[in-house]
């Protein structure tokens, strides 16, 4: 029986393989969540550069939020990331949820980024 870590690594690689097949040069919106925080970044895989990033560890978000581990925090990160992406000139991205299911905080971040103007 595979360990939990092995299962997560296999799931993340499966998701990334699907993303590479449909990306067509679009940057990737990568999401990582821990038990206390959520992080998101837009990565240009062709150039190997991070275009925009946001997380609940940033001082302005950290002071405004009660905790970094709820859907309100994920929504704030999604809106901030969409704002930074539009300043950088990025509109179309591919959503990379990694090994995390599209539910709860990951879904809240994605919906807030869509409302902020990102297309995926």
From Swiss-Prot:
Tagged with keyword Membrane: no
GO biological process: translation
Highest taxon, organism lineage: Bacteria
Keywords: Ribonucleoprotein, Ribosomal protein, RNA-binding, rRNA-binding
SUPFAM superfamilies tied to this protein: Translational machinery components (SSF53137)
InterPro entries per record: Ribosomal_uL18_bac-type, Ribosomal_uL18_bac/euk
GO molecular-function term, one example from the UniProt record: 5S rRNA binding
Xref: CDD domains: Ribosomal_L18_L5e
Cellular compartments per GO CC: cytosolic large ribosomal subunit
Subunit (UniProt): Part of the 50S ribosomal subunit; part of the 5S rRNA/L5/L18/L25 subcomplex. Contacts the 5S and 23S rRNAs.
Protein task: This is one of the proteins that bind and probably mediate the attachment of the 5S RNA into the large ribosomal subunit, where it forms part of the central protuberance.
Family statement: Belongs to the universal ribosomal protein uL18 family.
Name of the protein in question: Large ribosomal subunit protein uL18
């Amino acid at each position: 029986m595979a360990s939990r870590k092995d299962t997560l690594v296999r799931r993340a690689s499966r998701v990334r393989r699907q993303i590479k097949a449909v990306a067509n040069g679009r940057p990737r919106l990568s999401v990582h969540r821990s038990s206390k925080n959520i992080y998101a970044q837009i990565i240009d895989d062709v150039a190997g550069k991070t275009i925009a990033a946001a997380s609940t560890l940033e001082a302005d978000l950290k002071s405004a939020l009660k905790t970094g581990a709820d859907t309100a925090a994920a929504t704030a990160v999604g809106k901030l990331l969409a704002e930074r992406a539009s300043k950088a000139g990025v509109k179309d991205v591919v959503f990379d949820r990694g090994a995390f299911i599209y539910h709860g905080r990951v879904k809240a971040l994605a919906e807030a980024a869509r409302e902020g103007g990102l297309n995926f």
